[in-house]
Structures are given as C-alpha cells and as structure tokens.
Amino acid sequence: MLQKSKILLLALCSLALTACDHIADDERLIEVKNSPQTPDEPETAVRTVLLEDFTGQRCVNCPKGTEVIEQLQEAYGDRLVAVGIHGGPLGFKGTAKAKGLATSVGDEYFSHWNLEYQPVGLIDRHGATNYTDWTAAVRQQMSQPSSIKMALTATLGNGQIAISVEEEPYADYSGKLQVWVLEDGITALQSMPDGTNNANYVHNHVLRTPVNGTWGQDITLSKGTKAEQSMTQAVDPEWNTEKLSVVAFVYNDSGVEQAVKAPVK
C-alpha cells in the first residue's frame, strides 16, 4: 500500500511539472509594481516652490519670518527658493552711516500686490500669506506637480554674470520668465521682536536686482520642445560676488509654475 502511494505521488508531481512546461509566455502571471492607473497621464516635473518674503529692516516681526524660512529650507532643501524682498513702509534705504537693503523695485512689488503688513509672503504667487501660515502653504504647493522642468547656470567673469536658463515643458505654456540676483550674508541693521536694534544682523537671500526687467520677459513654450535664454547682469561694486546667486522662475496669472536657483560661480 505504501509503495502504491509513493508511485501515485511521483505521478502527480510529474504531471504538475509537465503542465508548467505548456504555459505560454504571454499567459504567465507577472507581478507589476507601481503600475499607473491612468497610462495616458501626462508627464510632470517635481515642483520647486517660490516664497517671496516681503520684509524690512524696520519690521520687528520680520526676523520671525526668517526663522520660519530657515526651518523650511532645512526641511525641503533646494525644493524651496526663498527671496527676501526689502521695501514697503518698513523698508530702509539707508543713511550715510547705516546700510539699507530696500529698493525701488521692492517698493513696486509691495504696492503691486496690495500688501498691507510685514512680514508677508507670496507662495508661488497664490495670494498674501502670513508668516505663521507659510509652512502649511509651502507643503500644500509642494504636493502639486509642475508642467515645466528648469535648469539654470550663472557664471562670473569680467564684472558680469552670464546667465543661462533652460525650460523643458511637458505641456504648452504661455507666461513670463523672471530672473533675479540675490545676495546672502549681508550684515546690516535690523529691528528685533524684543524692540532692540541689531546692527550685526545677517540678512540672506536678499533681492539685489531683477535681470530682465521688473516683471520679466514674455515666454511661450511648446510641449516637448526645450527652450533656452541667455542674458548678462553687471555686478554692482557693493555686492559680495562670493555670496551671489541667481533665481529664475516662470509665471502667469495662475501663479508660479516652476522656479530654480543657482549659485554664481
């Protein structure tokens, strides 16, 4: 009886192995990982968020906004581009003894967006946002894909910054390209939350000048066709060339679609 059981078991195993040999390649089960539910979904790029910080040296709460930005930069790294735009009623243009960081273009931006207080931010230009809400607003924007991938280089030579911007669109796009020069590590006066004035406050990502006009230049992109723009910016003698960077972003009435930042080398 035991011998018959062994023979039956061997026969069943042989049948199973033989059956497997007859499964066609196109009938085999294959594990598919991360298969998209919608194969025709358009390709997108990872979004880099632009935070325009409208600040001022006479603004006692603006250092609090800076602290939020530092926390966001630590959390998100290069995916957040912060720009300190000095101007408005609490901006300071300087005196013979004290360095000022406010600019006429900063004043123009402040007025254009109908801002009423400082610090206040624009997150991808989706309305004025109080600094206490920046973290949530940035997180929300980062969850949104972008239809454009951007690249940027900035090279210093002979007192000029040579700038090259490239866009790779995954959809047709019409809007504007804006390019700015920023400077880090500027030691200058700042009013503090405790009511004191700190003459040795270090200001970072300070907007120094727009490169291609106050509101940038028109840009039209066609899906699948890369575009590139080149421009130069003269270096102001007051700037520390070792602390300069360039920011480029594309925007339209729907907000900022993509941003990128690169150090000046």
Segments and roles (model prediction):
Residues 2-7, 15-50:
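Bacterial Sec-dependent N-terminal signal peptides
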Residues 23-31, 60-66, 193-195:
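Short N-terminal helix-initiation segments at or just after the protein's N-terminus
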Residues 40-87:
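Local sequence-structure signature of Cys/Sec-based thiol-disulfide redox active-site neighborhoods
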Residues 36-38, 68-73, 109, 136-141:
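Intrinsically disordered, low-complexity boundary segments flanking structured domains
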Residues 32-33, 64, 71, 103, ...:
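Membrane engagement elements in two modes
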Residues 84-265:
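Short, conserved sequence motifs used for protein processing/export or organelle targeting and
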